[in-house]
Swiss-Prot record:
Keywords noted in UniProt: Chaperone, Membrane, Mitochondrion, Transmembrane, Transmembrane helix
Presence of the UniProt keyword Glycoprotein in the record: no
Highest taxon, organism lineage: Eukaryota
Membrane topology: Multi-pass membrane protein
Organism for this UniProt entry: Danio rerio
Chain ranges passing through the membrane: 146-168, 195-215
Protein name in UniProt: Complex I assembly factor TIMMDC1, mitochondrial
InterPro entries the UniProt entry points to: TIMMDC1
Pfam families: Tim17
Amino acid sequence: MCTAVRQDLSLKCGGTDVKQPGDSQPGHLRALLGFTLPSVYASDSSTQILPKHIGKPEFPDTGWDRIKDLFYNVEGQYTEELRNVVKSGIASAIVGMIYGGLPGARHARQRFIQCSQAEIYRNRVDAVRAAHNAAIRGFLRFGWRWSWRVAAFVTLFNTVNTGLTVYRDQNALSHFAVSGAVTGGVFRLNLGLRGLLSGTIIGVILGFPAGVLILGLQNLGGETMRDKRRRERRELHELRVTEWNARLKVTDDLIGEMSSLKHQDSEIDLQQVEELLSQPRNGNAAKGPYNQ
């Protein structure tokens, strides 16, 4: 039960005091700070601030925007450039494993046979099995050494080349040269400054023929990777613009419907008020108790 108390202008509801806007501030806080604080009430607070406008989707025309598009896809899938980098890394790892493993297995088998001339086996099957086991160990040992090195080299090369191509939005042989220089320098960095310079020079020399080969294969396909990516990006931008226009149209239609409904409601309310005012007054209700 709520009771109004005029002395302190407070509303007491079940033992809880609810201060009115005209109440004074707490004495403890005023005594602590030494000055009065401005009062803020719920009725004075503004509604949630909404954005003034919904920005129109912009075409990613800068290098960093295109770089960010490599790692962001509306469909939640990886872009084709990243998939190509991963595929090339896996393929180079397999090639490196085969390239280093086969000679390593042959060398390990021959060395095992040479070192096991004085060893006695129970039968020929045990001797052949031991030689095969040595060849397998050699294949895995030497194949792994070549596999991760070739995979790292190719992955770093393709990563730098893809980054430069996407950032500048064009295919150029200089990108392959720079990629080869960076990759060769990194792989020869443990040899010091001379190794860094020699690796950079070798990378530049090998980057040009690799670029000519890759660009030639892409041109034979009728469409380069950059042209395909540019076309897909343009189509995606047009799709976003179309979706944005559709949402904007729906918003305008909704605002128009709300305005029309509000106008109709106000007219109905005004008509009801006019009808009430036009009705005759009740004579019995107009007479007071003292007029009887």
